[in-house]
Amino acid sequence: MKVKAAPRAKARLTSARRTGARGFTLIEILSALLVLSLLALMSYRGLGAVLDAREHTRYETDKWRRVAAFYARFERDVQLAAPRPVRSTTATGSGVSPAWRGEASATEQSRLEFSRFAATEGVDTARRIAYRLNEKNEVELWLWPGLDIAPDTLPARYPVLAGVKTFELQYLNPGLVWVNVWPSSPTDPPIPQAVRLRIVLASTEEIVRIFALQS
């Protein structure tokens, strides 16, 4: 004998089946889209921050690599400074330039200029060189072809460090006093005891280094 389900139980079963087959409502779909949009935005911002950080790290690494290379070059040059004056000849006459001639601020109008021995590895010759800060905020290296050169011979100029606001030098005299020009008196030796170089980068970092010179 078959047992028939009660009408109330049958209604509950039909309602449950309808509820299980019901799709998402519009509000649920919009809520899901909003959550997905927020997740995508957060992911995009996170990726952008990572890329920005990587670019900043690359820029800083390159900047300090260039600064380190410049200081290495400057140190090598000043430690090869030669206590040898040079003959200077121009259209107005001839004279002698001191072995080391320096001012406090090596700008476009002034510069650090000195005689330099040949490099020990034989890759360069004895010559007159100079450093100065040009109008483009670049430290320039000037290279003359030798020591005693022909009249009005112009040096080759090479930018060796960009993005420099300040390029200042001081020189240590035999009394262990820092002076702003060299030679500062007729009794000064051809080369100072040391040179102090202060650089301020365009990004505001300040670097000060002291280089002992060969006496």
Annotate each language-model stretch with its function:
Residues 161-215:
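Short linear sequence signals and composition-biased patches located at protein termini or domain-edge surfaces
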Residues 122-125, 151-152, 162, 190-192:
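Short solvent-exposed loop/turn micro-motifs enriched in small/polar/acidic residues
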Residues 1-2, 18-47:
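N-terminal single-pass transmembrane signal-anchor helix
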Residues 5, 11-17:
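Short, low-complexity intrinsically disordered segments enriched in A/P/G/S/L with frequent Arg
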Residues 42-147:
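Extracytoplasmic beta-strand-rich oligomerization domains located immediately C-terminal to a leader/signal peptide
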Residues 123-128, 155-157, 205-208:
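Short, mixed charged/polar active-site loops
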Residues 24, 129, 195:
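Residue-level detector of short, conserved catalytic/binding motifs and their immediate flanks
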Residues 145-159:
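Short aromatic-glycine motifs in intrinsically disordered, low-complexity regions
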